[in-house]
Structure formats: structure tokens, C-alpha cells
Regions:
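Short proline/glycine- and polar residue-rich coil/turn motifs
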Residues: 60-66
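Short, surface-exposed alpha-helix to beta-strand junction/turn motifs within ectodomains of secreted
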Residues: 27-59, 132-149
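Short S/T/G/P-enriched beta-strand
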Residues: 3-19, 90-124, 180-208
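Extracytoplasmic/surface-exposed domains of secreted proteins
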Residues: 1-2, 27-48, 66-92, 168-180, ...
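Short, acidic/polar linear motifs in exposed loop/turn regions
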Residues: 36, 125-127
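Short, hydrophobic beta-strand segments
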Residues: 71-76, 155-165
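Short, solvent-exposed loop/turn segments enriched in Ser/Thr/Gly
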Residues: 25-28, 112-120, 166-170
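Beta-strand-connecting loops/turns
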Residues: 56, 80, 114-116, 133, ...
Length: 208
């Protein structure tokens, strides 16, 4: 009885791209199996709907979970269209943000006591994609941002509070600079008043 042995070439992938979601206009959160620490920016291909390749600026692997990989691009992806991400022969699609501001907030509701801490305005779309991070004191035609405290001081973009429990007030507004026929602001968000509180170092949190 003759027996024939068939040899089959099995393609072994170094990485398997499982999913992609957008964090910021120029940042993607990818889930990737494999030795992710070895991924080079040049190995990841991101294409626009018109097949234009967007170069990847950096690849960053989460220190606690190696399947969580952040891909940063030089260009913004904010036209609401479908993009493709390819790595090691696997392609995953995602729809980019439409760049429409749905919410505004500050990045830190609490700051460490007696420590100068930068405060940023954060604007997000309806899906939570960060569209803008604006440090206090940076002028932008679409945003108003005031920061006041009687219990410390503001130095540039940084806030300092004297003791635990002391507060500052941030007031933020998003402006479309568009108006209705009767002259009212159209599509603005705010003004939102938010409180920032000084806490001891161990309990500091940030909005995610």
C-alpha cells in the first residue's frame, strides 16, 4: 500500500490585527495578538478611502496589556469616512470621526495639592473621540476657557491649589461661530461651569 505525504506551507503570522477604534483625530487604539513590542511604524499601513497611505508616526504598546497598541499618525483622520488599517496581511476597517463636537469637559476634576498642574479643555465627538485638547491660556477661535480660584494661583496653563479641598472654577464654551437667521448662536455648547478640587496625591483622577 503506497502512502503519500503531502507537505503544506502554512503561513505563520507574526501579528494578528483584531480590531481598531479611534481615540483621537490622529490616534488609533488597536487590539493585536503576537509579539507587539516588535511592530515597527513602517509595518502598519493606514489608507484613506481614496487609497492614500497615511504614514504612521509611532507605535506604542500598553505596559500592562501587550495586545493593546496605540497607533499615532502624522495626519488627522476626521472626515467621517471609512479607513483601512493593514498589518501582516490582516486588514481592519474603521470609520473616522465626523469632527463634530458633541461634548466639552476639562481633563482633570481633581489635581494634587500644592502642585502646579496643567489643565486642558477636552472636546469630544458623539462617540467619545477626542477632537481637541486645549491647554488653559491657549487661544482658539472656537473655544472660551476661563479658570479662577481664590485658594491658589494660575501660572500659564497650570493651576496650583493651597490645601486639600480647595477648589477652582473652570468655565468652558464651544462656539461654532455660526448664527441663525435671527442672530442667535447656532450649535454652541456651554458655557459649562466645572469645579476642580485639590486632593492628596493618591486620589487624583482624570476624566476618560
Amino acid at each position: 500500500k503506497d502512502s503519500a505525504t503531502t507537505t503544506k506551507d502554512v503561513e505563520v503570522k507574526n501579528y494578528v490585527l483584531k480590531s481598531v477604534a479611534q481615540n483621537k483625530t490622529n490616534e488609533l487604539a488597536a487590539t493585536i495578538d503576537g509579539a507587539t513590542k516588535n511592530i515597527k511604524a513602517s509595518e502598519v499601513t493606514i489608507k484613506t478611502p481614496d487609497n492614500v497611505v497615511l504614514p504612521v508616526k509611532s507605535v506604542s504598546v500598553d505596559s500592562k496589556d501587550a495586545t493593546k497598541v496605540t497607533l499615532t499618525t502624522f495626519s488627522d483622520m476626521n472626515d467621517g469616512k471609512e479607513y483601512t488599517v493593514t498589518l501582516d496581511g490582516t486588514t481592519v476597517n474603521f470609520v473616522a470621526t465626523d469632527n463634530k463636537v458633541a461634548s466639552i469637559n476639562i481633563d482633570k476634576p481633581t489635581i494634587p495639592v500644592k502642585t502646579e498642574t496643567e489643565i486642558k479643555l477636552v472636546a469630544k465627538d458623539a462617540n467619545g473621540v477626542i477632537l481637541k485638547e486645549l491647554p488653559y491660556g491657549t487661544s482658539d477661535v472656537n473655544y472660551d476657557f476661563s479658570l479662577t480660584t481664590a485658594n491658589g494661583y494660575v501660572n500659564g496653563s497650570k493651576l496650583y491649589l493651597n490645601k486639600v479641598g480647595d477648589t477652582a472654577t473652570a468655565e468652558i464654551t464651544y462656539k461654532t461661530n455660526k448664527y441663525t437667521a435671527d442672530g442667535k448662536a447656532d450649535g454652541n455648547i456651554g458655557p459649562n461651569k466645572l469645579t476642580i478640587t485639590a486632593t492628596d496625591q493618591a486620589t487624583v483622577s482624570s476624566f476618560k
